[in-house]
Amino acid sequence: MVHRVTVGWDGSAVALAPLEWAARHYPDAGSFELVQVDGGRRSRGEPLQDVEDAAEAFRQAHPSFEVSAVHAQGAVAEVLADRTAPDALLVLGGRGNEEQRLGHRTSTAYRVLLRAEGPAAVVPQSFRGGRDVVVGIAGPNDDPCVLLSAAKEAVSRRQRLVAVHVARPLLGLGLGALPGDPIGHDRDLSEYERMVDAALAPVAAAHPTLPIVRRVVRGRTADVLLAASRNAALLVIGRDDASPIDRRPITHSSVLLSRAPVVVVPPGTEVD
């Protein structure tokens, strides 16, 4: 369960989307806090609202929530990452203009996601809703918290869970398959499907009535996940802390280009 929701606030219209999104989907969170990093970069040409005023307006709109406003000093990514925890959710805004997002190769949101000690979400300003919760399955060594977190999101939204594993054969060949060998190709896919079933076993046990769709797709991981979640309500992906920071393009691409909100779940995230 998410016990606290922290929303990064920069006073712009981009910050409004994650705030309302969080209120809608996490009504049982114990508290909401809006964090404004004073001196941080703001969006040019947009009307700005101070964090205190924003917190008061949010409190008036949602009187059942405990709401606090925080002024902080320092580097934006570091300040926000320091406020994360395994039982809390950090929510950030994302640009709605895809071309504009393409230019931000080292986005603040991405830097926060790399350091966060708990789950963190990026909500595109242009998001208007969708169907299904899509989750990426990297392999048999995935932390169970990733799939269980995605399942819980699907249950709370009354949506299907669409579990996607992207098979990336070495040098274009399936494991144990020869070029043009359909039997080897089918055997390769069946092995991946068994792995997906095994990974989803804890989810099926915890949520026996949850509709689950299993997909094994060949292609580039980022492209497949973005296509699968194009009209989704949510995309959930795990964070591989074993990979070097400069070799995590999947999370980066998803944050920059996803049309759906993205939740990145680090190892050790608490799931009730």
Report each predicted region and the residues it spans.
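N-terminal membrane-targeting/anchoring modules of bacterial envelope and secretion proteins
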Residues: 3-9, 15-28, 32-35, 39-41, ...
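Structural beta-alpha unit
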Residues: 14, 39, 59-90, 97-99, ...
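Short conserved AdoMet
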Residues: 27-28, 84-85, 117, 155-156, ...
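Glycine-rich, Arg-bearing micro-motifs that act as flexible, cationic patches
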Residues: 69, 92-111, 130, 230, ...
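Short beta-strand elements of ligand-binding domains
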Residues: 91-94, 119-125, 262-267
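Extended, non-globular alpha-helical segments
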Residues: 103-126, 179-180, 184-187
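Structured core of small recognition/catalytic domains
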Residues: 160-252, 261
